[in-house]
Each structure stands twice: as structure tokens, then as C-alpha cells.
Amino acid sequence: MAETVAVRPAEGRDPGGFAYEDRPRLLEGLRAYGLIVAMWVRSTMAYRASFVMTTLGNLAATAFDFVTIVLMFTHVDALGGYTLPEIALLYGVSATAFGLADLLLGSMERLGRRVRDGTLDTLLVRPVPVLAQVAADRFALRRIGRITQGLAVLAYALFTLDIAWTPLKVAMLPLMVITGAAVFGAVFVSGAAFQFVAQDASQVQSAFTYGGATLLQYPPTIFAKDLVRGVTFVVPLAFVSWLPALYVLGRDYPLDLPRWVAFLTPVVALAFVSWLPALYVLLSLIHI
């Protein structure tokens, strides 16, 4: 059943109080998130030259990751049995999915600082979902540089790879980017919720977000199987790019999982995301 959310009356209505409407809490949070993001975008666009330069700087900084891989391939023909275009596919999917999550929810990593300095309390007294406020706080549009770079590498991979395309493989491409962004977003929120308890755990969170994105840019065959099991069954980062991308490439997964497991990516993303609001609220209540 939808929760009752207090909203301020529109112009021309009784200004003596609040009007109550039946509005789902989720929709109210999305609306608040959109309004806060729009405010930060307008603020960013007030200095367009600065925005362009910082975006280009962000793009250049992230591009060095792939340049490192290219330089590596000047000395070897394959890495873990994978060619440069195949690794470019893994890289492009991981970078694009992470870039989307970082753009939309990257501000969550600052929650620990808010808990420590007490500024989180100012968000708790506002009639807006706290999660929406924290996620949209200081929205950085310059992060589209990472997404642009990831899409460029992905385009290079698709152009150079010789893949026997089927309708399922074509459908898998946008699916793994979208669901991968959802999985990374869930990791961002999980790390932020953990900071209610740990308070100074931003580096731990970064190990799973930025570190996870870097991990997925390389083939799973170069890592120990225990690590591959961990990112498959414990923190399901493997469903971002490894499992679906290996299905597209027609390669077997190191853990000998059946290929249809790649199609569980949306299920895993939904399951991972669905319990996060409850976790966030629970740990915030512990903080209070």
C-alpha cells in the first residue's frame, strides 16, 4: 500500500497547512532526486568552460587505463588467453556500467563524512527521502567523461571482433550495461549504508566500487579461482561483465557454470537492489 506523503500546497490552495496525497515513497524519492540533480546541473552549466575542461580531464584520466592495456599488448599477443579486442569488450562494458552508476550514485561515498561532521542531521529533518538527498548531493555531470570513454572502447571492440551474432547476443549487449550499472549502484548504496556503522570506511567502499570496476576490465582467467568465486557468489560483480560478455564471446566461464547463467544478470541485479532500501533505513536507525 502506498505511504501517505506530505506535500506543500500548490499556489492558490489553502496556505494554512499541508495537503496530503497518496504518493508512493519510491516515486517521491525519484522526484526529489530529479529536482536536486537538476539544481546541480544548472549550477554546473553556469560555468560551461569549466565544465568542458573538467569533463575532458575526466575522460583523459580514465583513458589512461585502457592505454596501459594497449601498451601491455605491444609485448604480448594474449593475456590469459584473451586478445586485445576481447579484453576491450570486457573493459568497455565494465567502464560504461560503472560510469553510469558513478554518475547517478557516486555521491554516496561521501556519506561517511556527513555522519562524522554531523551534516547528515540537516537532511534527516527535511520532508524528503534521505537516500535521494544523499545520492543527488553535489551531482557531478563531468563524470560523463568516463561513460564516453567506456562507450568508445566498447565500440572499438564490437567493430574489431568477429562474433557470430544471434538475437540473444544482440539483446545481451544493452542488457549487461544496464544491469551492470544497477549492480554497481547497489554496491555504492551498500557501502554507504555500511558507513553508518564504520563511519570511516570510504576506502573499503572504493575497494569494491572502483576496485571492482578495474578487476572486471581484465579476463577472469588471470585471477585465482577463489577470487572468481567471491565476485560471482558473494559480491556478484561477475554478472556485470564477465558472465554476459563471455557468453557473447562464446567462451566458457572458469568455474564451469552453464552458459544460461549469463541470463540471470537481471535477476541478480534486481535481487541485489531490492533489499538495499531496507538495509539503508535499518542502519540509519542504528545511527540515530
Language model features: what each stretch is:
Residues 29-45:
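A short amphipathic helical element positioned immediately N-terminal to and/or at the very start
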Residues 41-57:
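Membrane-interface helix starts
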Residues 59-95, 254-258:
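Transmembrane helix-boundary elements of multi-pass transport/secretion proteins
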Residues 71, 103, 107-114, 119, ...:
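Membrane-spanning helices that line or support transport/gating and their immediate boundary helices
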Residues 87-152:
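Hydrophobic alpha-helical transmembrane segments of multi-pass membrane transport proteins
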Residues 142-201, 205, 254-264, 272-273, ...:
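Alpha-helical transmembrane segments and their short interhelical loops
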Residues 151, 184, 188, 192-248:
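Transmembrane helix segments
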Residues 286-288:
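Conserved small/polar residues in nucleotide/adenosyl-binding loops
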